[in-house]
Design a protein with these regions (language model features):
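Surface-exposed aromatic
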Residues: 58-63
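Short beta-alpha junctions and helix-cap segments that line functional grooves
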Residues: 105-108
Length: 122
């Protein structure tokens, strides 16, 4: 394996996937993202001086307050999973933007799907 820098920048690495998408009104991790979360948790475990920010997001449906809480629940769920897999709590910061920072500005299912997410920032 190369240096940490190479691992994070390698498009073939599972670490290149930095967005976890969620179903409507859900903070449950979809099974197709478990291996992504596992890879990031392992990376954090192997690199104890590395830290990340988990940004929780929601689509525009629902109140602003509700969506901030939903974004936070999503980020917390990803953090809990990473902790169970060996990451350290002090390596992970959480922030929720709710509906404030959409990945897509549309007002349809395809856009909303892109906005229901947690982004992993190194």
């Amino acid at each position: 394996t190369g240096s940490a820098f190479n691992q994070l920048d390698d498009p073939q690495s599972p670490l290149s996937v930095r967005i976890i998408y969620f179903e409507y009104d859900s903070s449950e991790i979809r099974s197709d993202y478990r291996s992504t979360i596992e890879a990031h948790a392992l990376y954090l475990q192997q690199n104890p001086n590395t830290s990340i920010i988990l940004e929780g997001h929601a689509d525009e449906r629902g109140s602003r307050e509700y969506n901030l809480a939903l974004g936070e629940r999503r980020a917390k769920t990803v953090k809990q999973q990473m902790l169970l897999l060996g990451a350290n709590s002090n390596q992970i910061r959480l922030v929720s933007y709710g509906e404030e920072r959409p990945a897509s500005d549309g007002h349809d299912d395809a856009s909303w799907q892109q906005n229901r997410r947690v982004e992993i920032l190194y």
